[in-house]
């Protein structure tokens, strides 16, 4: 029997939104057996541009796309939705400190959390793309007290996909040969792209790629700084690759994970790996019959433990900063 899902997308007229919506409407996130309503949220000045995007969506005549709502009111956007994809966020501008960015986005995500809490469907799931996504997710979660904390996620799949691509290039293999590539922690330059537990054609990545210097001193910094490299090269942040990773994430959160693999997503920690309960931290996860769980039996060497500590410390600092601002 055909299924139906209502999906809110914030920042819908932005570059990521533009790269995301057509693929959402064609069934690439929820499957070809699921019809979709799109609730599109934008700030008032961007509504004319969003109407242009809606015109294009209509012109595609997607069989799975049923209804579209265009609004600048979060209460309307989140009304009765099953998924809220929080893509829109205030960009970091020249001279802006990270604290300023947290404050500016904090008010946006606090308001959206409240609106989701009051208006969304009882089974709503929230996926945050807008940066700093871990802490934006934390803010939304803490402003939606009636929604179970395990329904909130932030995106680290883009980092995972970047890492898989780099390992495949270095090893001279196809992308599907690389599995179990884990991103730990924050979606920032402190993230830990964990090649030690990755596999290539079923073997440990460190056995296939024997160049330890490359793994430690090239691979990790390249993944950590990849977003900045894209901005430098094209004058704008990652859009198509971010939209692609968001679709991958939603698919992985819904569908059962293959037995020989896992995926990375940031979610509300419950004390796993020594991470403070309530922090939004990226872990290796699996989905089984619609239930998402963190893989808990992974052991870290000394290097890995240090990397986990670095990214955990940063997330604690961000949490403390938004707490001081009264956002959580």
From Swiss-Prot:
HAMAP family: Malate_dehydrog_2. Keywords: NAD, Oxidoreductase, Tricarboxylic acid cycle. Belongs to the LDH/MDH superfamily. MDH type 2 family. Substrate binds at residues 92, 98, 131, 162. This is Malate dehydrogenase. It holds the Pfam family Ldh_1_N. It comes from Coxiella burnetii (strain Dugway 5J108-111). GO terms for biological process: malate metabolic process; tricarboxylic acid cycle. Catalyzes the reversible oxidation of malate to oxaloacetate. NAD(+) binds at residues 11-17, 105, 112, 129-131. The active site is at residue 187. Its EC number is 1.1.1.37. PROSITE patterns: MDH. It is an enzyme of class 1 (oxidoreductase). GO terms for molecular function: L-malate dehydrogenase (NAD+) activity. The gene is mdh. It catalyses: (S)-malate + NAD(+) = oxaloacetate + NADH + H(+).
